[in-house]
Amino acid sequence: VELLIVVAIIGILASIAVPNFMTSVHRAKQKSTMKDIVSISTVITDYVTDNESTPAQDGTYNGSTDFYKALSPFYIKVLPITDKWGNDFRVWTGESANHYGISNPTLNDFLVASFGRDNKQDSFFFRPNDPEGGSFLLTRMSDFNKDLIMWNGSWIRRPGIRSRRGC
């Protein structure tokens, strides 16, 4: 009987601890992925400053692509290729930066995105009149599946606290 009570207590503690641990692991991966997106955006901005346009890119890249070679090692020693879930980053530059509702992109425009934990692109649509519309609260594990997106160095899709309208 005592052994059953001990096993039951361990089971209860495990059922509480494991989800909290998994949330912490994914939160750390998300924050680290966001830092990598900032790094990628910063080096693209530096490249634009020197060259007056972005290096051409339309989607995923690797160490042998022209995009990667244009940025590494001159602007950054090692350009991140995958997010912390092991999924490829997506970068769209110039005219190909027309995803997520961005219209009429110029040669200097760029998007950097992680498709999140599930590696599936969201149907997110950026609305310039509602810059906070891209923030979301982390309330469930599925929220780690949401895309993380920077446009020209500014977050348009990220976890955060949405302010209350009219307050």
Regions found by a protein language model. Give the residues of each.
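Short, solvent-exposed loop/turn and secondary-structure capping segments
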Residues: 33-34, 50-53, 57, 123-125
